[in-house]
């Protein structure tokens, strides 16, 4: 059967005597052409059709390059054709009522990107919340997926992504559960300078100028009270729901992973989050989102990993208790924990998780736990202490008073961390105690 089709060239491969051109209109197909065309060109191809697996191909007899105006028309038609679902949010807070229309806008962007076959990079943070968000977003469109072990989108990350995006069609970078902080701005600025569109889905306190560099989906845009409790994984699930994907079963896993109380969750939700955190620790072994999903759906493997994770946490409790040092200041108890005596690099649990073990031991008190190592100081603030102490505010003061010793820092009001120059942890700890 002969077919004539007009579309935007989104990918080019060279196979023997032909160039295989992937073209996008409202659908995608391949054109076998003896002539080369650049990614982004609009062509009209005419020829006989054939199937390669499930992919329709046109073996071109004629190929004509079209005008730039045609390209704009195709993009506009695709955008007009895309519809998203207008679901009620799963969590019915004032923040979500305001955020949900913006989640639908992001959903539409992603569906349009899928129809246009845009080159997409998805980076998700290496914890239960970030992984849940990554699973939700990756269900919407094809993307190169990377686990991000740092809370910062660095200049190095940006240069890696810029290099990967070279010669690809309308590149798009999506960051989930990280990338909104001040330290990420330099990396985001490079993406913008190279013309790469960026979407950041994050629930951490953001840099003031984040929206100059990215489409920013965040609860912080709609008020600070309880903003961080609206986890990035949950927000990503709402984006996926607007695209017709159902990941409601992962909402409480995301909340449990970040100890958010917006919905009540069961021990099973905590266990799922624990398994994801356990797996994320070993990301150097090439974990993928598909792997995380498969583990959650294989009962024997899931139970084995859950047992190992719980055993490791239980075995550390006595060591944590023995290494906690106690100080008092203005009615607040400050617990200091030397993490280098307990943590093993590259092994579960992480320094943050070990600090949380100490926090769980004292969470009923008016207390702050400061876990420290050669390069990090980790904050955990109990509910009672949080009435007077804000971890993020302390970090900002430390950044101002000792900028030469601080590499980065931030997080939530009751759970945050500082990265410091090696060997200065004692001096910075004393500064923190003074501020408290």
Positions of the model-derived regions?
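An N-terminal, well-structured beta->alpha segment
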Residues: 68-123, 139
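Short aromatic-glycine-enriched beta-strand elements
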Residues: 14-22
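Glycine-rich, acidic loop segments that terminate in or are immediately followed by a histidine
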Residues: 337-436
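Beta-strand/loop nucleic-acid-binding surfaces
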Residues: 24-39
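OB-fold/S1-family single-stranded nucleic acid-binding modules
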Residues: 48-77
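A structured phosphate/pyrophosphate-recognition subdomain
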Residues: 115-120, 127, 210-347, 356-375
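Structural detector for short beta-strands of small beta-barrel domains
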Residues: 1-15, 45-47
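N-terminal small/polar loop signature for handling phosphorylated ligands or for N-terminal nucleophile
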Residues: 111, 119-120, 126-129, 139-211
């Amino acid at each position: 059967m002969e077919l004539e089709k007009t579309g935007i060239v989104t990918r080019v491969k060279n196979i023997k005597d032909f160039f295989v051109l992937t073209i996008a209109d409202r659908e995608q197909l391949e054109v076998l052409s003896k002539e080369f065309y650049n990614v982004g060109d609009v062509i009209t191809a005419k020829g006989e059709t054939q199937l390669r697996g499930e992919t329709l191909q046109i073996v071109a007899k004629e190929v004509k390059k079209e005008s730039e105006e045609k390209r704009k028309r195709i993009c506009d038609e695709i955008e007009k054709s895309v519809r998203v679902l207008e679901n009620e949010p799963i969590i019915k807070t004032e923040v979500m009522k305001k955020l949900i229309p913006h989640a639908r806008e992001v959903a539409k962007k992603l569906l349009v990107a899928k129809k246009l076959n845009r080159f997409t990079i998805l980076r998700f943070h290496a914890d239960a919340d970030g992984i849940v968000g990554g699973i939700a977003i990756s269900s919407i469109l094809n993307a190169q997926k990377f686990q991000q072990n740092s809370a910062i989108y660095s200049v190095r990350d940006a240069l890696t992504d810029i290099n990967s995006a070279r010669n690809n069609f309308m590149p798009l970078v999506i960051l989930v559960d990280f990338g909104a902080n001040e330290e990420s701005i330099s990396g985001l600025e490079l993406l913008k300078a190279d013309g790469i569109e960026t979407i950041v889905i994050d629930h951490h306190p953001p840099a003031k100028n984040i929206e100059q560099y990215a489409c920013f989906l965040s609860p912080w845009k709609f008020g600070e009270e309880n903003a961080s409790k609206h986890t990035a994984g949950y927000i990503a699930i709402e984006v996926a729901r607007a695209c017709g994907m159902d990941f409601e079963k992962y909402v409480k896993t995301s909340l449990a992973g970040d100890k958010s109380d917006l919905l009540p969750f069961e021990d099973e939700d905590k266990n799922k989050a624990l398994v994801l955190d356990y797996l994320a620790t070993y990301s150097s072994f090439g974990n993928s989102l598909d792997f995380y999903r498969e583990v959650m759906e294989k009962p024997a493997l899931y139970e084995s990993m859950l047992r190992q994770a719980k055993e490791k946490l239980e075995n550390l409790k006595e060591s944590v208790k023995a290494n906690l040092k106690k100080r008092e200041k203005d009615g607040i108890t400050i617990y200091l924990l030397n993490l280098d005596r307990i943590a093993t690099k590259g092994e579960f649990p992480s320094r943050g998780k070990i600090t949380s073990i100490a926090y769980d031991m004292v969470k009923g008190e008016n207390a702050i736990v400061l876990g420290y190592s050669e390069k990090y100081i980790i904050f955990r603030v109990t509910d009672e202490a949080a009435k007077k102490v804000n971890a993020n505010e302390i970090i900002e003061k430390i950044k101002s008073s000792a900028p030469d010793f601080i590499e980065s820092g931030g997080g939530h009001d009751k759970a945050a961390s500082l990265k410091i120059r090696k060997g200065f942890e004692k001096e910075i700890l004393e500064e923190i105690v003074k501020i408290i």
